[in-house]
């Protein structure tokens, strides 16, 4: 194979990419880029690989270039929109994803990603419409169903959210995310026993998921049950993410329930220091100071 054979480089790089050999694919695309840096296909694919390798700055630069070279490239608008959305730059993400849809409205994933952005911006009605559009194109896609459920939860339509999530959990009994989504809805309803069961199932399917571990520890604390396990889970999450206020809050709740109010107050103060304007954490501090915990069941 001669490196100067541009189309052969592209074919080889594509083959590596399809096989999941990202490093080899990247090297081959970089050779292709040296041969023709103004080729929009090369830039688009470099962007995709950098994104898959979590090299977001490089991915964004390549995708920006791809869009400049070919403004009709819907996929690059979508990929860049997704990356920008992950940084919560909602305005730019909305613009990019809207462009992607204008260029190719039949891609369900484009509508789904835009739905997530609209949800992030607090535009619940429009987000719900986008999730419905995505589901109209791919009715069985569980991610799209979870997206719609999130919008329903924001609208306080908790029973409707459960009605669409529960059937998926029967069909996709190994999908940890569905069980976690159901756990979150039951938590919102205040049905902590049901929520705990779904959260335990989710963690069983995907051990080591810190969000799930934190939620389960919090549920145990709320039920004043299984507190040693709650403390163990919470400690693990904080070891991995010592500055996550919601993880700090969980440990403070466990300490409070265990009757260690002074430690709980010191711990929740850490969360308040990180997000001084959060009213919930201030409310927690007041509770720890003024309300005696119920003795554990």
For each of these PLM feature ranges, what is it?
Residues 6-7, 40-41, 74-75, 108-109, ...:
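Helix-start (N-cap) detector for alpha-helical repeat units in TPR-like alpha-solenoids
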Residues 1-2, 35, 69, 103, ...:
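Structural marker of alpha-solenoid helical repeat scaffolds
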Residues 14, 48, 82, 116, ...:
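Residue-level recognition of tetratricopeptide repeat
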Residues 18-19, 52-53, 86-87, 120-121, ...:
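Register position in tetratricopeptide repeats
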Residues 184, 210-241, 246, 253:
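Alpha-helical adaptor scaffolds
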Residues 1, 31-32, 65-66, 99-100, ...:
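Canonical positions in the second alpha-helix
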């Amino acid at each position: 194979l001669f490196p100067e054979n541009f189309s052969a480089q592209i074919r080889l790089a594509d083959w590596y990419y399809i096989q999941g050999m990202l490093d080899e694919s990247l090297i081959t695309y970089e050779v292709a880029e040296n041969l023709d840096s103004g080729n929009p296909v090369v830039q688009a694919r470099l962007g995709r690989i950098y994104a898959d390798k979590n090299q977001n700055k490089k991915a964004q630069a390549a995708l920006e270039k791809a869009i400049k070279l070919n403004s009709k490239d819907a996929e690059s608008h979508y990929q860049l929109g997704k990356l920008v959305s992950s940084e919560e730059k909602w305005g730019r993400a909305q613009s990019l994803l809207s462009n992607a849809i204008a260029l190719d409205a039949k891609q369900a994933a484009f509508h789904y990603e835009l739905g997530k952005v609209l949800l992030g911006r607090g535009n619940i009605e429009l987000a719900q419409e986008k999730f419905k559009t995505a589901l109209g194109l791919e009715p069985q896609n569980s991610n799209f169903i979870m997206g719609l459920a999130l919008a329903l939860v924001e609208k306080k339509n908790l029973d409707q959210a459960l009605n669409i999530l529960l059937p998926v959990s029967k069909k996709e009994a190994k999908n940890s995310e569905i069980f976690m989504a159901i756990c979150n809805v039951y938590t919102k309803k205040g049905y902590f026993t049901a929520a705990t069961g779904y959260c335990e199932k989710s963690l069983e399917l995907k051990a080591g998921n810190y969000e799930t571990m934190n939620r389960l520890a919090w549920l145990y604390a709320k039920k004043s049950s299984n507190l040693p396990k709650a403390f163990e889970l919470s400690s693990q999450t904080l070891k991995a993410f010592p500055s996550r206020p919601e993880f700090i809050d969980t440990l403070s709740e466990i300490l409070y329930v265990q009757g260690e109010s002074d430690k709980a107050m010191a711990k929740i103060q850490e969360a308040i220091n990180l997000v001084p304007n959060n009213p919930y954490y201030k409310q927690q501090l007041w509770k720890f100071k003024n309300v005696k915990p119920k003795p554990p069941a």
